[in-house]
């Protein structure tokens, strides 16, 4: 897990996992990206937490890379590695239920928004050449196969986790989890999404993103190139790696066209 200045959410998330899954013995690796709100001090109150510190410039992908690298240094062997976000309000027994599903598979735990609608989960490609995907959850206990995932809650068998490469260093914030999942699929790992929500995690509103057409072109461009937006170099790399060069050339230009045309 990675965190930055969300002490209450971070503490609540860890407490939810520990208290809600009494049959599981957790060991946490948390990348704290230079929080100034007492997050690091609060984390030290938990048993079994290893903290790796950043300087405030890690963002999501950088923080997760640091945490994953630290976890792989462990001399102990675990059953699973759980990737999760600290803004997930986990339901009781959510992770225990995932652990009881089919072995040897990467299981994605879908989340809902506050209205009970799917917010994050498994991700399936709609096209082999267009970067169009859909977020899905299963409709049966057997789960549904997917191509990648939102890493808000992902349970990876330890042996699989150790073999996987870390998150690509090109990514600062967004796209890192999608790319990580695609890499896992290419390595031969099977990814399935569960049929039960593991908790609540509202998705990010369009109003704060570069896609908000009410913003000026200048502001939209600034937000797009921000690490939390869709930086051009990272987006091109993502498209080339997970689709092809032609797709990367065409679709890396489209966001700029949308901004110019106010769409």
Identify the role of each PLM range.
Residues 76-89:
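Short beta-strand-to-loop acidic/aromatic patch adjacent to the donor-nucleotide binding site
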Residues 15-25:
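Short, acidic, metal-binding catalytic loop of nucleotide-sugar glycosyltransferases
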Residues 89-124:
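Conserved donor NDP-sugar-binding/catalytic core segment of glycosyltransferases
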Residues 16, 32-41:
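A conserved acidic beta->alpha catalytic loop
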Residues 149, 154-165, 170-197:
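A short, conserved alpha-helix in the catalytic core of glycosyltransferases
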Residues 206-263:
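Non-catalytic, C-terminal membrane-associated alpha-helical segments of glycosyltransferases
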Residues 54-73:
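Glycine-rich, basic loop-to-helix element that forms the pyrophosphate-binding segment
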Residues 135-156, 222-223:
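A recurrent flexible, glycine/aromatic-enriched loop bordering the glycosyltransferase active site
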């Amino acid at each position: 897990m990675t965190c930055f200045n969300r002490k209450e959410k971070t503490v609540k998330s860890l407490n939810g996992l520990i208290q809600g899954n009494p049959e599981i013995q957790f060991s946490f690796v948390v990348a704290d990206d230079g929080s100034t709100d007492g997050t690091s001090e609060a984390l030290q109150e938990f048993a079994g937490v290893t903290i790796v510190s950043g300087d405030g410039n890690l963002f999501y992908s950088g923080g997760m890379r640091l945490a994953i690298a630290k976890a792989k240094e462990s001399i102990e062997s675990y059953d699973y590695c759980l990737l999760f976000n600290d803004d997930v309000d986990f339901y009781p027994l959510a992770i225990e239920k995932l652990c009881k599903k089919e072995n040897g598979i990467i299981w994605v735990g879908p989340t809902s928004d506050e209205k009970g609608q799917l917010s994050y989960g498994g991700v399936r490609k709609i096209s082999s050449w267009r970067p169009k995907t859909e977020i899905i959850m299963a409709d049966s206990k057997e789960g549904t196969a997917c191509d990648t995932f939102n890493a808000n809650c992902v349970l990876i068998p330890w042996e699989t986790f150790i073999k996987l490469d870390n998150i690509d260093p090109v990514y600062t914030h967004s796209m890192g989890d999608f790319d990580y999942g695609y890499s896992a699929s290419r390595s031969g790992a099977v990814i399935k999404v569960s049929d039960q929500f593991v908790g609540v995690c509202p998705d990010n509103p369009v109003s704060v993103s570069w896609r908000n057409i009410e913003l000026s072109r200048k502001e939209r461009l600034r937000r797009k190139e921000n690490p939390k937006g869709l930086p051009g170099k990272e987006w091109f790399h993502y498209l080339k790696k997970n689709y092809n060069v032609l797709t990367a050339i065409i679709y890396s230009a489209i966001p700029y066209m949308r901004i110019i045309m106010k769409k």
